[in-house]
C-alpha cells in the first residue's frame, strides 16, 4: 500500500492503491496500471476516484483530476470528529466509524486512515471487517460518512432549534 502526499491549492491528495493490470495479446503481455486516490481539503470535503492508464503517473494524475471533480461535503463535529457512530457496507467490506474524544487520534487502518486524513478528521475509531480490499473499504467508508447527520440537519427535520438537539447529546 503506497501513500503519497501532495499539497496544491489547499487540497491534499493521497494515493491509496496501485494495481498492475496485465492484458494478454497475440504478441505477448500488455501492462497497464490502475490507481485509487482520495483527495480532500481537510475541512469536510472529500473525493474518491479510480483511474487506469499505461503508466503509473498518468493513472495517478487521471484519478486525482476525477476525484477533484466529485468532491462531496461531510459534516464534522468541532472540525475534528464525526457527529455520531455510523456503519457502512459495500460488497464484503464493512466498516464501523465511531466518534472519539479529543486527543484520541485516528485509530484506523490503511484506506480508512487515508480517507480520515484528507477529510480533516483528527479523532476517530474505525473498525473494518470482512474484506481488506481497498476499493470496497473506501466505498464502505464513504457510504458510512454519507449516512451521518449533523445536528443542524436533524433540527430542521424535527422543526426544533439546534440547541435543543445538541443538549440531548450524550
From Swiss-Prot:
Family label: Belongs to the universal ribosomal protein uS5 family.
Domain notes: The N-terminal domain interacts with the head of the 30S subunit; the C-terminal domain interacts with the body and contacts protein S4. The interaction surface between S4 and S5 is involved in control of translational fidelity.
Originating gene: rpsE
Entry-linked PROSITE patterns: RIBOSOMAL_S5, S5_DSRBD
Residue intervals of the S5 DRBM domain: 11-74
Biological source species: Pelagibacter ubique (strain HTCC1062)
Single GO MF descriptor: structural constituent of ribosome
Complex and partners: Part of the 30S ribosomal subunit. Contacts proteins S4 and S8.
InterPro entries: Ribosomal_Su5_D2-typ_SF (IPR020568), Ribosomal_uS5 (IPR000851), Ribosomal_uS5_bac-type (IPR005712), Ribosomal_uS5_C (IPR005324), Ribosomal_uS5_N (IPR013810), Ribosomal_uS5_N_CS (IPR018192), Ribsml_uS5_D2-typ_fold_subgr (IPR014721)
Record GO biological process: translation
GO cellular component, one term: small ribosomal subunit
Protein name, entry field: Small ribosomal subunit protein uS5
Function: With S4 and S12 plays an important role in translational accuracy.
Keyword RNA-binding assigned: yes
Keywords: Ribonucleoprotein, Ribosomal protein, RNA-binding, rRNA-binding
Amino acid at each position: 500500500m503506497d501513500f503519497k502526499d501532495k499539497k496544491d491549492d489547499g487540497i491534499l491528495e493521497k494515493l491509496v492503491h496501485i494495481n498492475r493490470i496485465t492484458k494478454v495479446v497475440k504478441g505477448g503481455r500488455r501492462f497497464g496500471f490502475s490507481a485509487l486516490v482520495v483527495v480532500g481539503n481537510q475541512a469536510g470535503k472529500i473525493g474518491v476516484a479510480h483511474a487506469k492508464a499505461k503508466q503509473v503517473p498518468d493513472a495517478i494524475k487521471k484519478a486525482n483530476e476525477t476525484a477533484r471533480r466529485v468532491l462531496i461535503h461531510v459534516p464534522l463535529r468541532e472540525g475534528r470528529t464525526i457527529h455520531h457512530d455510523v456503519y457502512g457496507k459495500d460488497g464484503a467490506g464493512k466498516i464501523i466509524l465511531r466518534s472519539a474524544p479529543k486527543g484520541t487520534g485516528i485509530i484506523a487502518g490503511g484506506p480508512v486512515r487515508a480517507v480520515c486524513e484528507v477529510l480533516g478528521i483528527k479523532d476517530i475509531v474505525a473498525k473494518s471487517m470482512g474484506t481488506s480490499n481497498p476499493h470496497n473499504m473506501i466505498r464502505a467508508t464513504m457510504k458510512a460518512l454519507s449516512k451521518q447527520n449533523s445536528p443542524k440537519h436533524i433540527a430542521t427535520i424535527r422543526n426544533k432549534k439546534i440547541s435543543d438537539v445538541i443538549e440531548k447529546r450524550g
